[in-house]
Amino acid sequence: MSTTVVLGAQWGDEGKGKVTDFFASTADYVVRFQGGNNAGHTIVVGENKIALSLTPSGVLYPNCTPVIGSGCVVDIGFLKQELEMLNEKNINTDKLVISANAHVVMPYHKLLDELIEESLGENKIGTTKKGIGPCYADKIQRKGIRIQDLLDETNFEIKVRKNIEDVNLTLTKIYDHSPLVVDDILDEFSTYRDIVTNHVADASLLIANAIKNKKTILFEGAQGTLLDIDHGTYPFVTSSNTSSGNAAIGSGVGPKNIDRIVGVTKAYISRVGSGPFLTEQNNKIGDFLIEKGAEFGVVTGRRRRCGWLDLISLKYSVRVNSLTELFITKLDVLSGLEELKLCVGYKDNDEVITDYPFNQNVLNSAEPVYETFDGWTDDISTVKSFKDLPNNAQSYIKAIEAFIEVPITFISVGPERTENIII
């Protein structure tokens, strides 16, 4: 038996999909514990690219049970489309489990998300407008609708009608928007009831029994640590806890049941949307990373902001998550650069900071302090052992490992499943 958490150590888009897929091949269960379809990852299988946003990666393996945990928020209409896409690719989705306690993203959540974001103007967060934030807000305000509510048609209607009363007041009085028609929403969700009935379960009990029976379980995180609602670059964050502690809470298991916590980072760093980014490269280096790394959002299609790897924020992620090890992806993207840089400090008012600052304002005013490394030109996509990497690539990896003080045990050198180095 083993229980492993895989999560992003940056602002998301670290290549978690490939890493999760690596673990999922031997897992009995793969559990998503937070987020919704605001996150996306692409898994390359031969000539096919499969983009998933809500369904756990374990769905690709017939012996694995994919679980959407209690900490997730579920857009059932989107889930229906994603399951249909998988079925068209002859991928069986019958084993999917959805926690009865997961919350439902309603149509009014998506509308409110869009209106709120537009109202912020230049101060916008950069939300995906998928309704995730408003759905989590309803959850905290104790008026959310959960998956189990759809099983009782009468109770579901009562809750929806009550919520629509409040929503329509907000729409008409604050945003000058036409009110929503409650019957349209009820009609739409009547077509989703079979999906819920076929997949709903007590996910916490299911996972607890799996642990008791010595099964292998993978907890799959979405987004990244620096987007955590409590520990990220607030307010430019997501609406859930993306750090490792939520793997237990969002799945319904105790933290002592977690054996291994794997952080995933790119060999550089990227960010989608607004917010501070000290090592961002708005120059030819940034363009190189974006184009060679195909840095465009799976969900939004937006061009990602790219820059040099920030070891201060990475060491912070190690601490916040109690990472046991680090996986590095996209090392191959750096091939061809004459010079590489690692951020090893923040300079603020003539003071060099080497710990991630608790005062977020520092991130808006500080300057990065870099250590410079020679690059390499070799194609490393076929390399299978660390010793066969170019010497400069080895030096780069060793410098990262020495700074963050946890072992690097996996390096991805290409997008294919097999293009990896296991250390």
Task: Give a label for each model feature.
Residues 1-423:
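Non-transmembrane, aqueous-exposed alpha-helical and coiled segments at domain scale
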